[in-house]
Amino acid sequence: MNASPKIYSPKELLQILTSAIRAEEFSVAHGQHCIIVDARDLRTPMRLKQLPNCPLIALHPDSTFNVATTVLSDFDCVVSEQELEPVIAGIRAQPIAASTLCHLLRHSQNLTIEQALTAESMAYGLLQSSVGFRNWLATR
């Protein structure tokens, strides 16, 4: 990695996301590819009212997230320290695709299958016309 990403505490995340203006700064458009939160000591869900416009990653020793456990349910991804670097590298390589995927999955949770497929098709079509996709395709 070029530089170690900042790892936020749950309290810092809440402070960021309580301000719509500050929350907006956490997006690919502002050069923020993801937010990493040290979630080792979380005991209850954060119940975030809004999510950032970039992937929200929980750093947790047990990355085998159990869907029955809702403590980490606000996060897009749960990784251990060993898994963090490859995940960050993937996000940095394709930040728009990573952000699009997170938004698609967040949005699709409460949709019908038909609505979710429409949203997925729109996202996929837009990504296929992106510079990032063309660059990736050229390396294949």
Regions found by a protein language model. Name each.
Residues M1-R140:
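C-terminal alpha-helix plus adjacent terminal tail
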